[in-house]
C-alpha cells in the first residue's frame, strides 16, 4: 500500500506549525511498514530531513508495522473507532506493531500524531483529485 507521497509529505509536515512545535529537538528515524512497502521518515532537530520509500525491516528509531487494510483504515479521513489513535486503538485492537525506542515515541507522541494527521489530509486530497 502506498502510504504517502514522500515529497509532498516532507513539504507538508515541515510547513505544519503544530508539528514543528511538537517535534522540536526530536531526532529519529521512523519506518512505517506494510507488507508491500515501507516509508522511511528521518527527523533531525524537529524537521523532516528526508522522506522516501524504503525496504521494510531496516533499522529505525521507531518502526510501525501494519497490514495494508490496517493502514487504509488508520489513514482514512475519518477513521472508524479504534483506528483514530496509534497506541490507544490500533496496537490494542487491530494488530499494529510498534517497535524501537518507545520512550522517544512517548516523548514525541503529539508530533507523531500530527505526522499521521498530515498523512490523512494528503491522502484525502489525493483521493478527491482522482
Predicted segments with their positions:
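Feature captures hydrophobic
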Residues: 1-130
